[in-house]
Amino acid sequence: MQGSTDSQSRISSVLPGAASCRNQCFTYYIKGTERTVNHLCLSSILIREGLLIMENTRFAGILGTGHYAPEKILTNADLEKMVDTSDEWIRTRTGIETRHIAAQSENTSDLCVHAAKQAMEAAGVTADDIDFILVATASPDYVVPSTACLVQDKLGCTHAGAMDISAGCSGYIYAVAVASNMVKAGMYKHILVIGAEILSRLVNWHDRSTCILFGDGAGAAVIGETEEGYGLLASDLGSDGSLGKILDIPASGVAEPVTHRAIDSGRIYIHMEGPEVFKAAVRHMGATTLKTLEKAGVEKDDIDMFIAHQANNRIIQAIAKRLQVPADHMWVNVDRFGNTSAASVGIALDEAVRAGKVKHGDIVVLTGFGAGLTWGCDVMRWM
């Protein structure tokens, strides 16, 4: 640490008690409120306040966002004609009214490209500036090659590395964390992150428990270096493979290949044990968010924009209630998009940004939960 003596006096003046640690806890003040944190959080607070400067420290975060939704819209009224359901039943239980459905001519990589171009334009970068591409998806164009490689070709990012991330609905959260830390480590300057899905081809349109939920779309972001103290402040990624069977596609790989029997029995489609998924989602999204806020040295009251995975409205509201996030500090679009899995947080974030709801210096919290089971949270100070 540079200028340790001078920094010590500055720390003491701004963070009373930080100079004399007792029981590995520090007391500091923000907006006139006394707060106490453990020693693991102190570095995040000092960096954020501009009091701690490490040699070769890089800061990284989102420079621009974009999203894309296919033109076709499927309404609840349309679904009433397909399965035994009703608009009232769907809205009451999920909050969903419409969802976008990809055309037969569109693949996941195509949705990625549309969203990526928006994000690159917003970030002021070109295809030549992109050093690496991360695509989070559960509905890739192929098993191999990766969807990220197809996107690399379609965008003309000729010197970029590329790979897919398979973390279900948590994929965008995972990708933002991985990309930000790759930039912080000095590996790359600009990384394109995309969460994209065409789940309409993976649901059984005769199963009303799943076909009413999912939609297609893509959300993208360009990750790069930010000003000191801005960008990703902290992240947390978790998983529990022992519960993987409550949300899966049984016949989708070498453990259970696609056969005529698997097709006839419906095992090639999304299978979900709704009540168990609901309980796990609320528990883990709440816990990972609180853990990440602590890592970042940020209180719940400091949150300016909270975006949770848009699974269904009941889950979103349960998370918000647990975290005591007011409605005007949230962005919810599940009513218009349905559950777009890895795309949902990216789509919601871009909408919030373009609506002017996310401003320079705002604390933005992204949290998600998905198949795996996986979960995660990113806390950032917006550029």
Question: What residue ranges belong to the model's regions?
Answer:
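Catalytic phosphate/nucleotide-handling subdomain of diverse soluble enzymes
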Residues: 347-367, 373, 379-383
